[in-house]
């Protein structure tokens, strides 16, 4: 069978350096949702719950009556105003997005000559930039995956970093992230999981800097993956360039309503409570997995864990046969076939995972 007809699993048995040479588009766009089948116990997708909480469902249901009209400029501004209030920014420094990933699709409009992406991390930025013909330099951080700004080429006029980072669960200090700044360089910080981090979380979203863009997602904490809700905060000139040529009415009324609702004070309090719950569940889960002799990357601060185990690809298949989905790690640059990512879950689901691991390890 030729490479172009080979199955993804066969391709992913190659060494890490070879992964991106075999159908790179497919590998860079491999996400945890493809691991999950109906009825599976899901540790592969980093979304909390099966759907939005009742209060948010009610809010969206009320907004259904507006679907006969085009999304209004007033509603869009009100949502930007609410996001801005949450972060202490101006509404003009907020750009509403159809999911945080849409922000990555806009990065080529900033016309970088060389982009540096910090890995292991989310690979959508690499895919988008390479599709646009932008040279991409992958900076591979070795375990324990702490940021080393000296590894970034000085010539890079765009640097993209996740904080906390998917899949390592590492939270980089704010000072380290800002140390990536250079004259003529734009630093893009993917804070998709920031609202799930207990405490201040080292976010830079509230810092009004003309060379830093922060991308946020509302998908994870609020279980809105199907609605696609997110936003960017950054300098007005940078945001204007990012959305140049964007279609009119880029977000629907329900997306706009969800973004506004999820950044209001009540929702922020709910997210804070959820981050406390995640912190407790993560601590318990680490203890359970550590007792099995698994190596957990850390200190973990996100709602997922990066696990190293010999023969992780075989372990994943054995778990799959038992109706348990975990995220393979070998599609992330810098990781190999001995890594898995598992979402933080409650004790009932962790019991199921641990029982299965006791059998397959």
For each predicted feature, which ranges?
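PLP-dependent aminotransferase class I/II
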Residues: 51-53, 74, 211-290, 294-297
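Short loop-beta-helix segment that forms the pyridoxal 5′-phosphate
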Residues: 71, 84-106
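Conserved PLP-anchoring active-site segment centered on the Schiff-base-forming lysine
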Residues: 108-130, 135-137
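PLP-dependent enzyme catalytic core of the Aspartate aminotransferase-like
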Residues: 321-322, 333-361
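N-terminal "arm"/small-domain region of PLP-dependent enzymes with the aminotransferase-like
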Residues: 1-70, 85, 155
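Conserved PLP-binding catalytic core of the aspartate aminotransferase-like
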Residues: 278-279, 289-322
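Active-site phosphate-binding strand-loop segment of PLP-dependent enzymes
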Residues: 137, 141-196
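Short, conserved charged micro-motifs
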Residues: 54, 311-318, 348-353
């Amino acid at each position: 069978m030729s490479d172009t007809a080979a199955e993804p699993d066969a391709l992913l048995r190659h060494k890490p350096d070879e992964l991106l040479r075999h159908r790179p588009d497919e590998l860079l766009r491999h996400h945890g949702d493809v691991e999950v089948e109906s009825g599976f116990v899901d540790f592969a997708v980093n979304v909390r719950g099966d759907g939005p909480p009742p209060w948010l469902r009610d809010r969206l249901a009320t907004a259904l009556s507006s679907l006969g009209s085009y999304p209004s400029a007033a509603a869009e501004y009100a949502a930007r105003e609410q996001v801005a209030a949450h972060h202490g920014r101006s509404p003009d420094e907020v750009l509403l997005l159809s999911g945080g990933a849409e922000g990555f699709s806009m990065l080529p409009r900033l016309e970088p000559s060389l982009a540096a992406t910090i890995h292991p991390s989310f690979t959508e930025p690499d895919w988008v930039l390479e599709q646009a013909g932008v040279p991409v330099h992958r900076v591979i951080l070795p375990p324990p995956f702490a940021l080393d700004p000296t590894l970034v080429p000085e010539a890079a006029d765009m640097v993209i970093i996740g904080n906390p980072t998917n899949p390592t669960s590492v939270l980089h200090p704010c000072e380290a992230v800002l140390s990536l700044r250079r004259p003529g360089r734009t630093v893009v910080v993917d804070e998709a999981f920031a609202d799930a981090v207990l405490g201040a979380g080292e976010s830079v979203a509230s810092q009004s800097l003309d060379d830093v863009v922060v991308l946020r997602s509302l998908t994870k904490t609020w279980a809105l993956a199907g609605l696609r809700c997110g936003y960017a905060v950054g300098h007005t000139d940078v945001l204007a360039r990012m959305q140049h040529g964007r279609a009119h009415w880029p977000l629907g009324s329900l997306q706009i309503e969800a973004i506004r609702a999820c950044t209001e004070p009540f929702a922020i309090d709910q997210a804070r409570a959820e981050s406390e719950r995640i912190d407790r569940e993560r601590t318990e889960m680490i203890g359970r997995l550590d007792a099995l002799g698994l190596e957990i990357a850390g200190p973990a601060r996100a709602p997922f864990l990066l696990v190293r185990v010999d023969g992780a690809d075989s372990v994943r298949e054995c778990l799959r046969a038992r109706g348990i989905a975990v995220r393979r790690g070998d599609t992330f640059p810098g990781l190999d076939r001995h890594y898995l990512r598992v979402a933080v879950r409650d004790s009932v689901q962790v019991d199921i995972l641990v029982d299965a691991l006791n059998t397959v390890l």
